[in-house]
Each structure stands twice: as structure tokens, then as C-alpha cells.
Amino acid sequence: MTLLKDLLADPGLPRLEARMLAEHVLGRSRAWLLAHDTDPVEPAHEAAWRQLAARRLAGEPMAYLLGGREFMGHWYALTPDVLIPRPDTELLVETALHWLQGRAAPRVLDLGTGSGAIAVSVALGCPQAEVTATDLSAAALAVAEGNAQRLGARVRCLAGDWYEALPAQDRYDLIVSNPPYIAREDAHLAQGDLRFEPRGALTDENDGLAALARIAGGAPGRLLPGGAIWMEHGWDQAEAARALLRQAGLREVHSRRDLAGIERISGGYL
């Protein structure tokens, strides 16, 4: 049988990825792998590892192969039905949590929740909040509901297209969203991890601003007086996003930069 150290030395994969796949297949920690690197690997485990390795070599994201990824300090289960949460999106959550500080029972809406990473992170960071998450995809909502339950977050999940998922009378203190903002002709859709992620979570099949326009335009009708909205967008879309928010009648519209200095989110107040 193949020894563990020989499996991890497979030249096809970076060693870190090889180890992560082994941890996943064997259900063991890194420390265990180091202590048992001369152990033989059961044929079934080796076959499972090699199958995952082949998928990785074909470009499939590690997050899908491992069944999840960490975001804001918590592990989120993921399937190919949902977008993989990026560190960039943590700015949206951090901004939301900062704005919610000191509010007794704020009502928060996450539009297009996907895996639920944003909604669940807000609910965990602000336990007194009433968080609602929407998504057009039933499969995505199932992932979000599973993550909320596993992490003990209080999140109401509703199926539907943006604001159409909501009861007519619902109003919110805060709206957040990381919508599809890649233009349909963008070459990046055929590159890297994006090839494997749900297209509907990446592109609006338009110019990249259609979903942002719907969210901004519908915000005044769904925000409580003094409420806020924050939207994530592309690196070159901040000016356009601000224009959409101003056109909707929101005030004090501005953008915030991520750690790389990119204007990553834009928002305003009712």
C-alpha cells in the first residue's frame, strides 16, 4: 500500500492542497498526518484522495472539494449551488456590524444570500438582530438554512427574486447584498474558480449593474426611516453604484475601501 508521505508528495498538487485533501478524506488533523506519515493508506482512502486530486487538477475549487470554507471565523458548508465566500466580502459584514452597534432589535435583510455567509455572520455578530435572507435558488437557500442551523444563527430564509421574496409589509433597518455584478461578456467568467461557480451568482447576464440597480432602486420602499443599505460591487463599479444609490433618493452616499485599497462596497441612508 502507498505510504501517507508518498501520497502527500504527489508531484501534481501543491503540498498544502494535497495535505488538505488528505485531512478531508481521512478525517484527521494536520498534526495527525505529520505523526503518521509513514502509515500505509487504505486503498479506499487513496482512491478517494486521487479522485479529489484529479478534480482539483482540472481546476475545481478547493472549497467545493472540501465541502466548505471559513468566513469571518466560522466554517460554512458549500456546494456548487452557491458562490464561494471571499475575504473581500468580510468588509460588508464588518460595516454592517459596526452600523448595528447599540441598536436594540434591528431588522436586517440580506438579498441574494447564497451560502448564507453574510446573513449568518451578521446574526452571530449581532444576536439581537432579526435577520432575513432571500435567494431565488431553492438549492442555495437549503445551504444557507443548513449553515444557520449548524452555527446557531437566527436567520429567516425566503425564496424569491430580490424584494419579491418579502411580505409586502416588511421594512428593515439595514439592507446588505453581494449580488451578481460581473458583466455577461467578461472573460473572467471562463477562468479559474468562476468556471465552477453558479453563473447566476456571478453575472446579471447584462452589463454587471442590473442587479445593483434593482437593489438600490427598491431600497427606499423597504427601509425604515434612517435605515441604511450597503452593496458589494466590482473594483471599477463604485462610481456607478453611488450614482444608482443617489438616483434612488438615498443620502450620504459613499464607498468604503478594502484592505487592498479598492472601493469594494457602496451605501447610503434613507
UniProtKB/Swiss-Prot annotation:
Keywords: Methyltransferase, S-adenosyl-L-methionine, Transferase. GO terms for biological process: methylation. It comes from the Bacteria. It catalyses: L-glutaminyl-[peptide chain release factor] + S-adenosyl-L-methionine = N(5)-methyl-L-glutaminyl-[peptide chain release factor] + S-adenosyl-L-homocysteine + H(+). It is an enzyme of class 2 (transferase). S-adenosyl-L-methionine binds at G112, T113, G114, S115, G116, D135, W162, N178. InterPro entries: DNA_methylase_N6_adenine_CS, HemK-like, N5-glutamine_MTase, PrmC_N, RF_methyltr_PrmC, SAM-dependent_MTases_sf, Small_mtfrase_dom. The keyword Transferase applies. GO terms for molecular function: nucleic acid binding; protein-(glutamine-N5) methyltransferase activity; protein-glutamine N-methyltransferase activity. The keyword Methyltransferase applies. PANTHER family: HEMK METHYLTRANSFERASE, MTRF1L RELEASE FACTOR GLUTAMINE METHYLTRANSFERASE. Belongs to the protein N5-glutamine methyltransferase family. PrmC subfamily. Its EC number is 2.1.1.297. This is Release factor glutamine methyltransferase. Pfam families: MTS (PF05175), PrmC_N (PF17827). Methylates the class 1 translation termination release factors RF1/PrfA and RF2/PrfB on the glutamine residue of the universally conserved GGQ motif. Substrate binds at N178, P179, P180, Y181. The gene is prmC.
